[in-house]
């Protein structure tokens, strides 16, 4: 587990974004942990989150030209990460960003895109990948503008097999996205990093077995 991933998992716990217990998740499964990036909802926490996104992106060594935030959750993520990159000593230059509207605007500048023109190698930023719908829409928008999707950058990779229990895919939603679009998915942290923390920190030992069992059943 990298220092960035370790620090991010602890940060998510401190902010109440990552919790342990019993939670019904979007898939309908009962999960022993829950990651809710919507709880990064203050200037300080979003600023720190953006610094983690920026570091994970730079650590990946990816060649990219700009950021794209899919509406709605990706909008503040792309904006804040562009700010974090602008002040990062490893970043080269001022990174532009753009985002889309869900509804086209029929006055002013019009259209569904806001921000810098989509061009070059574009990184899509989101919190997690569940079904891959926002990624698909983003890829279509970027390609339609004549630009190239370069990667998807997310906060947490749940490393979880997609599909209903009776027809589980052998792959996770993240793996499906990478294969379908031929682009890497970069995550700040993953379920493997959460499990490493549970192994290393005795204060979370009570949750270790349930998370391990969940990964055994649904993990990739």
Curated annotation (Swiss-Prot):
EC number: 2.4.2.10
Protein name: Orotate phosphoribosyltransferase
Cofactor(s) of this protein: Mg(2+)
Organism: Bordetella avium (strain 197N)
Transmembrane domains' residue ranges: none
Classification via SUPFAM superfamilies: PRTase-like
A Gene Ontology term for the protein's cellular component: cytoplasm
Binding sites annotated in the UniProt record for orotate: 34-35, 130, 158
Family the entry assigns: Belongs to the purine/pyrimidine phosphoribosyltransferase family. PyrE subfamily.
Gene symbol of the encoding locus: pyrE
Pathway(s): Pyrimidine metabolism; UMP biosynthesis via de novo pathway; UMP from orotate: step 1/2
Catalyzed chemical reaction(s): orotidine 5'-phosphate + diphosphate = orotate + 5-phospho-alpha-D-ribose 1-diphosphate
GO molecular function, one term: magnesium ion binding
PROSITE patterns listed in its UniProt record: PUR_PYR_PR_TRANSFER
PANTHER family (alphabetical): OROTATE PHOSPHORIBOSYLTRANSFERASE 1-RELATED (PTHR46683:SF1)
Residues holding 5-phospho-alpha-D-ribose 1-diphosphate: 26, 72-73, 101-102, 105, 107, 126-134
GO biological processes: 'de novo' pyrimidine nucleobase biosynthetic process; 'de novo' UMP biosynthetic process; pyrimidine ribonucleoside biosynthetic process
Binding partners and assembly: Homodimer.
Function recorded in the entry: Catalyzes the transfer of a ribosyl phosphate group from 5-phosphoribose 1-diphosphate to orotate, leading to the formation of orotidine monophosphate (OMP).
Keywords: Glycosyltransferase, Magnesium, Pyrimidine biosynthesis, Transferase
Lineage: Bacteria, Pseudomonadati, Pseudomonadota, Betaproteobacteria, Burkholderiales
Superkingdom in the source lineage: Bacteria
InterPro entries: OPRT (IPR023031), Or_phspho_trans_dom (IPR004467), PRibTrfase_dom (IPR000836), PRTase-like (IPR029057)
